[in-house]
Amino acid sequence: MYQFQQDNQYFIFNFDRTFDQATEFFQAEFWQKQERVIGSAKGRGTTYFLQTEDWFGVNCALRHYYRGGLWGKLNKDRYRFSDLETTRSFAEFHLLQRLYEAGFPVPKPIAARIQKGKLGICYQADILTEKIENAQDLTALLQTQTLPKETWTQIGRLIRKLHDLQICHTDLNAHNILLQQIEQEQKCWLLDFDKCGEKSGDFWKVQNLNRLKRSFEKEIRRMNIQFTEQNWADLTAAYHQ
């Protein structure tokens, strides 16, 4: 792991060396000129999927951090700086690395960057993570098919494992759960650990599950996904085992 500074930019790479193109790695235009953008996904901003296996060992997802809600309309992507380790991208990088090393199914963190403003009070942030191949999020899958009990059981156990580590996923929703097809088997992954972290106690765990259920109910209305109360019962039964 290599951490370094270039002027007002701070980087961390999951390698033991730096790169001449460190700044460019976090610019979509650089990858577009290299003809290495192989896809994208829309959220608050655009996540770019990059052909980087020959450089980093895996293909990557590049994401810029944006604010949401009303505040995001006034200040779309600047955050107040206090210390490096609590910045959005560095905090997510370290949490992903901790989970990845524990064998939890999350994307491997590849690199993170923050760029301070002229006064050093605020910063902008970006992160590069592993792209999970041959995978779709639950909302995409459930628009065209139902999922068997075994899949809901796997999801329930995955969330329980996360909670047993006392990690609170503050945005646990159907979009942040991926199903990867590996030959005849499916593997579940969790994404987007921005603002997530360790949390004591148990009171928040029920709230976490309730948030997930509300996201399914929202997508029933919005996308007519194929999700039933029995699916939820299978998920929660596995969670409580």
Swiss-Prot record:
Record pathway: Bacterial outer membrane biogenesis; LPS core biosynthesis
Top enzyme class: transferase
List the active-site residues.
D171
Q: Which GO terms describe its cellular component?
A: plasma membrane
Q: Give the UniProt keywords, A-Z.
A: ATP-binding, Cell inner membrane, Cell membrane, Kinase, Lipopolysaccharide biosynthesis, Membrane, Nucleotide-binding, Transferase
- Where primarily located? membrane
Location(s) in or outside the cell: Cell inner membrane
Function, as annotated, reads: Catalyzes the ATP-dependent phosphorylation of the 3-deoxy-D-manno-octulosonic acid (Kdo) residue in Kdo-lipid IV(A) at the 4-OH position.
Full protein name: 3-deoxy-D-manno-octulosonic acid kinase
- Tell me the organism: Haemophilus influenzae (strain PittGG)
Q: What is the lineage of its organism?
A: Bacteria, Pseudomonadati, Pseudomonadota, Gammaproteobacteria, Pasteurellales
> Encoded by which gene?
kdkA
